[in-house]
Amino acid sequence: MCTSLTLETADRKHVLARTMDFAFQLGTEVILYPRRYSWNSEADGRAHQTQYAFIGMGRKLGNILFADGINESGLSCAALYFPGYAEYEKTIREDTVHIVPHEFVTWVLSVCQSLEDVKEKIRSLTIVEKKLDLLDTVLPLHWILSDRTGRNLTIEPRADGLKVYDNQPGVMTNSPDFIWHVTNLQQYTGIRPKQLESKEMGGLALSAFGQGLGTVGLPGDYTPPSRFVRAVYLKEHLEPAADETKGVTAAFQILANMTIPKGAVITEEDEIHYTQYTSVMCNETGNYYFHHYDNRQIQKVNLFHEDLDCLEPKVFSAKAEESIHELN
């Protein structure tokens, strides 16, 4: 599954953050795609060339499969599961660009520089149904995108084409569709951070056992609707972040409330579904932050510290084991 959200800091930095929740061990790494790098789409074999360099979390499978990333123009994107709702074209349409679902992040970050650019270019995009060999299934995906304006988009593939929504909450999870999640928020308008006052009932003076009574009814389970509501609530009432570092910390703190520990969710196939990594990327600085399940220390790679005109993709080896800062 997965949860994603965006934040704006007081100094106008914009971050896109996500959890990667999955049962299959993805084995992802941070990878840089340089400018003018050619890759061939599995849809039609056509060669594509990157206009913009980008960095993100991915895995090499012939082409590199990216789950999320940020490019040099400040456009960021994350792919999340959309089971039961994602529908793709069965055949190639003439006079359009053809890609398969798991190539969308690569395509959009390599040729688009803003959300307006995305809106324009997807008019001539066809996403063709094709299995990802690694999982032997067609990945049902939808995508959240952000840029330096602070605006956000959600793109969902449906039977009648690609649906593009301005994502005002700046939150996305999984199925149902985005409009359903936004409508569902109306059920939670009474939830608030402020403690409720003591009250007299039946001749008794009643007061809360402790803080948090205003959040009674805030869903705490791991289903997509509950995670969506929880993320919107936490983002809405978050103490403003002064700068990028504070914003990144805040994003990790919010997503910690959606993180799934091993054993808490078991699939129908008796597989452990858990949060494999959490990442946060800043649209202005090109910083890509992340931590893995087995190492909670935040690690960082900066896009602009690299040669963006290098000839081949570059893989960054992350420390997998827990890193503990010892004080004595």
Curated annotation (Swiss-Prot):
Hydrolase keyword on record: yes
Active site (UniProt): C2 (nucleophile)
PTMs per UniProt: The catalytic N-terminal nucleophile is exposed by a simple removal of N-formyl-methionine, unlike L.sphaericus penicillin V acylase, which undergoes a post-translational autocatalytic cleavage.
SUPFAM superfamilies noted in UniProt: N-terminal nucleophile aminohydrolases (Ntn hydrolases)
Enzyme nomenclature, EC number: 3.5.1.11
Cross-referenced Pfam families: CBAH
MF-aspect GO terms: hydrolase activity
Alphabetical keyword list: Antibiotic resistance, Hydrolase
GO biological process terms held by the UniProt record: response to antibiotic
Effect of pH on activity: Optimum pH is 6.6-7.4. Functionally stable in the pH range 5-12 but loses activity at acidic pH.
Keyword tRNA-binding: no
InterPro entries found in the cross-reference section: CBAH/NAAA_C (IPR029132), Ntn_hydrolases_N (IPR029055), Peptidase_C59 (IPR052193)
Regulation of activity: Penicillin acylase activity is enhanced in the presence of the reducing agent DTT, indicating active sulfhydryl group in the enzyme. Activity is inhibited by the chelating agent EDTA in a concentration-dependent manner. Inhibited by cephalosporins and conjugated bile salts, substrates of the closely related bile acid hydrolases. Progressively loses activity with increasing concentrations of the denaturant guanidine hydrochloride.
Catalytic activity: a penicillin + H2O = 6-aminopenicillanate + a carboxylate
Temperature dependence: Stable at 40 degrees Celsius but steadily loses activity at higher temperatures. Rapidly inactivated at 60 degrees Celsius.
Subunit structure: Homotetramer.
Function noted in UniProt: Catalyzes the hydrolysis of penicillin V to 6-aminopenicillanate (6-APA). Can also use the synthetic chromogenic substrate 2-nitro-5-(phenoxyacetamido)-benzoic acid (NIPOAB). Shows negligible activity with penicillin G, and no activity toward ampicillin, amoxicillin or cephalosporin. Lacks any detectable conjugated bile acid hydrolase (CBH) activity.
Family: Belongs to the peptidase C59 family.
Name of this chain's protein: Penicillin V acylase
